[in-house]
Amino acid sequence: MKQLLDFIPLIIFFVLYKTNDIFVATGALIIATAVQVAVTWFLYKKVEKMQLVTFAMVTVFGGLTLFLHDENFIKWKVTIIYAIFSIGLAVSQIMGKPLIKSMLGKEITLPDTVWTRINMAWTGFFAVCAVVNIYVAFTLPLDVWVNFKVFGLLALTLIFTLVTGGYIYHHMPKETDSE
């Protein structure tokens, strides 16, 4: 249910962009993201930091997009969010407390070297997504960017998550039969 909530604002943005324009879609994205945060709080009594960062960025950059009637701000939002995630993961690694381990370490037991590799892989992934978004957003037509934002980045994230899951599975301690 929680993962479904994460996709609702994106779906609303896409549908309203295709049926209206970037400004209607952006306004709806701001509202849908606010509702998403409220519903998450209501259902789980907790909102993840990443979700709050995303909400803040959607509100600020979406608001600038609407107020200045300039689609470039909503395009920058994607890059800035990915950059924040990348920098956050890198800083957590430098401080010796990989954020990925903090998020998943209670459920999954892995050696610290594996957590470090996963944390650095996601650091790189988010950095690459930030750079690719800049390229697509500012060199290709708006329609291409919207499709890339909704489907391309989602597909890349899903694939990278599956690859990470396979890597984690490969490095999980194997249960031994003690009979």
UniProtKB/Swiss-Prot annotation:
Superkingdom in the source lineage: Bacteria
GO cellular component: plasma membrane
Location(s), subcellular: Cell inner membrane
Family matches, as Pfam families: IspA
Keyword Membrane: yes
HAMAP family xref list: YciB
Cited function: Plays a role in cell envelope biogenesis, maintenance of cell envelope integrity and membrane homeostasis.
NCBIfam families per the UniProt record, alphabetical: ispZ, PRK00259.1-2, PRK00259.1-3
Protein name: Inner membrane-spanning protein YciB
Organism (species): Photobacterium profundum (strain SS9)
Lineage: Bacteria, Pseudomonadati, Pseudomonadota, Gammaproteobacteria, Vibrionales
